[in-house]
Regions:
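Secreted/periplasmic proteins
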Residues: 1-92
Length: 92
């Protein structure tokens, strides 16, 4: 499962864990342990849409979630109103 962050939660414009400025509309993700800069292809199996993101932050810290996508990345593959969606991902 993945969720999204950055719009309406105060994170847009803050410094991410890798030292970059977080852009909620960019194509980034948070992951608990993957090295910063790692590129991942995220695919929503329910609609086939995919997006390539870069790991820039740490999290999510909610049980059952493996990624926390930026709002911009999430809206590429799913409706942000859903809040969460199932995804498949691969390192590229």
């Amino acid at each position: 499962m993945t969720s999204h962050y950055g719009v309406g939660d105060g994170y847009h414009g803050r410094i991410a864990a890798d030292g970059s400025r977080f852009d909620a509309y960019g194509l980034t993700t948070a992951h608990r342990w993957m090295p910063f800069g790692t590129k991942l292809r995220i695919t929503n199996p329910s609609n086939g849409r995919s997006v390539v993101v870069r790991v820039t932050d740490r999290g999510p810290f909610v049980p059952g979630r493996v990624l926390d996508l930026s709002y911009g990345a999430f809206r590429t593959i799913a409706d942000p109103g859903q809040g969460v969606t199932r995804v498949c991902f691969e390192r590229i």
